[in-house]
């Protein structure tokens, strides 16, 4: 007879989050919020996303299909949910946090070619599922600081019933068998639709979703009941009975006013306490000090500021998810609500178009992107912000567009990027040397950009150095093109200052117009939005929103000859910022 296994109750616990009925129910936010609650109870939590698509990573996927690509410190291109994980846990994750079917199959096929399966017939079970399990269990190993997590939360992408998700669900089922049932918790997110004609909430879709999960061999321990309203106790009892789940494990999650309210919603329903009891974790009260301060700033802003996001993919806001969350966090730092005006970059190609799109905003943000479409509109928005003294922040492609606009302003009329016009006579933005084979089609496109965290040195006394409070910083990157150093001196005649470079001085990382020329005009080749946290806003975004507030208040309170109204504006800004209450941000953001 096979020997029975013994499992330690002190082992790392695994929580699997699956979804049913429909996609886009908020599995990622649910998982992130539960992670935040467990972290607030004093536990060390890490998270992982299993994506069932065949792409190796989302790096080459259309932003309109996938949304943004979130880059980790170690340079992995990952799903946007990993950004939620980092923001809610307030910790950096690695490339291990995102596993795709493409990665799994690539690894298994490579092992087969090397003969590692000793002549076995390679199959989905056990070879694919074993590879998935190894990646799940690897998350319970020590992190860079040598600490093992108390809890690993793994979100399984897709919907129960999808063909693509079946190997991942089977692997999760096997993990429960391998590490012990007491060490695994299955949380299933399901839709409870409301039918307006009959005025009823319907439980049948959830029942069918759980039945499909059971057919795979997984009995959920708790259910997240997604609805646009509270699920009444009678329906909770019915769902608990029909799905064989404790009533305490049936969690009603109506739509919340803010994503940062979701931890409070889950806590009020008792989910975190239920998980702690079921897994035998140490029971500590939730420390709401940090998150409660955040919610106060979310719901009690003292000012409102309007920021134009001038982008190419504005029809799908998820394409700029980290940017919008970083803007909102910059607002939290200044006790302000940030309203985002989504501006298609094409709308700003003409001066009249830029005036119509940007005339009523307090700041302009130029985000990253690829390709020539909409570039002239971005240049028009930059020109408008420069002439009108409207605060501007450029990110990645935003820096490249700022440099092109500055070059054209000093007589290099056909200045352009080698990306948009390879034959331009003035390639002020050029292809990085190690990217030329990729551009020529002689190397892989995916996973070959300049990716991950890189250091930069900032000029003493510069706007960016003052914003960071340091002259040495580190930011994450994702690009193939750089400022052409042959044009630095000529571009500098426009007044644009190259205020931050790589430590060797070769790569331009930050540009700006000095404070005596413009109230705030900064651009970076990096993606600082990826390091922003709601509880620790990134200093560049905090400074940008602060400048936008000043711009707004100066419009409201014009300067008189004695400067009295300027002083009044400064007092109002100082009160609204209230920076002493914001957690300090280190030089790395």
UniProtKB/Swiss-Prot annotation:
Listed GO CC annotations: cytosol
Chain ranges of the Glutamine amidotransferase type-1 domain: 306-554
UniProt pathway: Pyrimidine metabolism; CTP biosynthesis via de novo pathway; CTP from UDP: step 2/2
Location of region: Amidoligase domain: 1-281
Residue numbers binding UTP: 23, 202-207, 238
Catalytic activity: UTP + L-glutamine + ATP + H2O = CTP + L-glutamate + ADP + phosphate + 2 H(+); L-glutamine + H2O = L-glutamate + NH4(+); UTP + NH4(+) + ATP = CTP + ADP + phosphate + 2 H(+)
Main EC class the enzyme belongs to: ligase
Annotated region (Disordered), positions in chain: 562-589
Keyword GTP-binding in record: no
Residues annotated for L-glutamine binding in this entry: 369, 397-400, 419, 480
Residue positions of the active site: 396, 527, 529
Name of the protein described by the UniProt record: CTP synthase
Protein encoded by which gene: pyrG
């Amino acid at each position: 007879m096979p020997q029975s296994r013994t499992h330690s109750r002190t082992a790392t616990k695994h929580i699997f989050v699956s979804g049913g009925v429909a996609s886009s129910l908020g599995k990622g936010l649910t998982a992130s919020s539960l992670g935040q609650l467990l972290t607030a109870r004093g536990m060390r939590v890490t998270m992982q996303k299993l994506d069932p698509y065949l792409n190796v990573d989302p790096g080459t996927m259309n932003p309109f299909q996938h949304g943004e690509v979130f880059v980790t410190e170690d340079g992995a291109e990952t799903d946007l949910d990993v950004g939620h994980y980092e923001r809610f846990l307030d910790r950096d994750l690695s490339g291990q946090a995102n596993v795709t079917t493409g990665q799994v199959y690539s690894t298994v096929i490579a092992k087969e070619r090397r003969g590692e399966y000793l002549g076995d017939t390679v199959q989905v079970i056990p070879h694919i599922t074993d590879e998935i399990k190894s990646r799940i269990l690897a998350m319970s190993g020590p992190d860079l600081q040598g600490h093992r997590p108390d809890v690993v939360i793994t979100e399984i992408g897709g919907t129960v019933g999808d063909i693509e998700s079946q190997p991942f669900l089977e692997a999760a089922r096997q993990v429960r068998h391998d590490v012990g049932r007491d060490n695994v918790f299955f949380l299933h997110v399901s839709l409870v639709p409301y039918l307006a004609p009959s005025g009823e909430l319907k439980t049948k879709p959830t029942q069918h979703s759980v039945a499909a999960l059971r057919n795979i061999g997984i009995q959920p321990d708790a259910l997240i009941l997604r609805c646009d309203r509270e699920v009444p106790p009678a329906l909770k009892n019915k769902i608990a009975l029909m799905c064989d789940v404790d009533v305490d494990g049936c969690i009603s999650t109506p739509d919340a006013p803010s994503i940062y309210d979701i931890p409070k919603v889950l806590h009020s329903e008792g989910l975190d306490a239920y998980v702690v009891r079921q897994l035998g974790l140490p029971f500590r009260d939730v420390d709401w000090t940090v998150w409660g301060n955040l919610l106060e700033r979310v719901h009690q802003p003292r000012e409102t500021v309007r920021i134009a996001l001038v982008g190419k993919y504005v029809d799908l806001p998820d394409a700029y998810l980290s940017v919008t969350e970083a803007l909102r966090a910059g607002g939290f730092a200044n006790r302000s609500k940030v309203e985002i005006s989504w501006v298609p970059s094409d709308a700003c190609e003409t001066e009249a178009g830029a005036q119509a799109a940007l005339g009523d905003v307090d700041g302009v943000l130029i985000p990253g992107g690829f390709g020539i479409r909409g570039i002239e509109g971005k240049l028009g928005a930059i020109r408008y912000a420069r002439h009108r003294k409207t605060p501007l922040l450029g990110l990645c492609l935003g820096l490249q567009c700022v440099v092109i606009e500055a070059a054209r302003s000093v007589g290099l009329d056909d200045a352009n990027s080698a990306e948009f016009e390879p034959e331009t006579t003035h390639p002020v933005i050029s292809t990085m040397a190690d990217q030329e084979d990729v551009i020529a089609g002689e190397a892989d496109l995916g996973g070959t950009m300049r990716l991950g965290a890189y250091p930069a040195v900032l000029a003493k006394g510069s706007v960016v150095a003052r914003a960071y409070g340091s002259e040495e910083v580190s930011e994450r990157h994702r690009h193939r093109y750089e400022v052409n150093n042959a044009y630095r001196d000529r571009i500098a005649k426009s007044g644009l200052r190259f205020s931050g470079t790589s430590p060797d001085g070769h790569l331009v990382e930050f540009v700006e117009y000095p404070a005596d020329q413009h109230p705030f005009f900064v651009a970076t080749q990096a993606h600082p939005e990826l390091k922003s946290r709601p509880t620790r806003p990134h200093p560049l975004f905090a400074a940008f929103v602060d400048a936008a507030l000043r711009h707004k208040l100066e419009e409201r309170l014009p300067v008189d000859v004695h400067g009295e109204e300027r002083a009044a504006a400064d007092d109002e800004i100082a009160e609204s910022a209230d920076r002493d209450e914001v957690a300090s941000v280190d030089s790395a953001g």
